[in-house]
């Protein structure tokens, strides 16, 4: 489904939180949305492999990487795994790499920056916890909508029709 965050903000201005404009689109899908699953991991993407193995239909993974742009948390392998398991998208408060490959995949991926250095894969981190970045607090189960203009968050799903 295609989302227009500007229209959604006009209609639901009282119900949505707007994430600060820190993110750029790196995936092949320019708009995406769904129920979020949160994860907090710093320069380590081992836990992301486990989470992206799950069925992602209607879901968006929100990754709090502490804002670090020294190591990329998402690479082509993880993005392909997410696509295979039908995730709608990934938002990374951190960096990605292999951006030409990411742009070819039909999945939404937004992040702060790109860097060629990969993350560790020790599996250090926590999932399904409250995370806060971009002026917004994210809880697993909230609903996120993203496009090239921005990212918005709602406690309940928005009536898009």
UniProtKB/Swiss-Prot annotation:
CDD domains: RraA_family (cd16841). One of its GO terms (cellular component) is cytosol. The keyword Nucleotidyltransferase does not apply. It is found in: Cytoplasm. Pfam families: RraA-like. Its main location: cytoplasm. One of its GO terms (molecular function) is enzyme binding. It comes from the Bacteria. NCBIfam families: NOT-MenG, PRK09372.1, RraA_entero. Homotrimer. Binds to both RNA-binding sites in the C-terminal region of Rne and to RhlB. Globally modulates RNA abundance by binding to RNase E (Rne) and regulating its endonucleolytic activity. Can modulate Rne action in a substrate-dependent manner by altering the composition of the degradosome. Modulates RNA-binding and helicase activities of the degradosome. HAMAP family: RraA. This is Regulator of ribonuclease activity A.
């Amino acid at each position: 489904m295609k989302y227009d965050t500007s229209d959604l903000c006009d209609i639901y201005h009282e119900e949505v939180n707007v994430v600060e404009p820190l993110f750029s689109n790196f995936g092949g899908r320019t708009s995406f949305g769904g129920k979020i699953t949160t994860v907090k991991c710093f320069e380590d993407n081992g836990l992301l492999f486990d989470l992206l193995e799950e069925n992602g239909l209607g879901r968006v993974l929100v990754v709090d990487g502490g804002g670090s742009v020294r190591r990329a948390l998402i690479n082509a392998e993880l993005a392909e795994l997410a696509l295979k398991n039908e995730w709608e998208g990934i938002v990374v408060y951190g960096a990605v790499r292999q951006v030409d490959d990411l742009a070819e995949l039909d999945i939404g991926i937004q992040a702060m920056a790109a860097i060629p250095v990969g993350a560790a894969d020790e599996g250090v981190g926590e999932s399904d916890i409250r995370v806060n970045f971009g002026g917004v607090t994210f809880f697993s189960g909230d609903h996120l909508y993203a496009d090239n203009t921005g990212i918005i968050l709602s406690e309940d799903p928005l009536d898009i029709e």
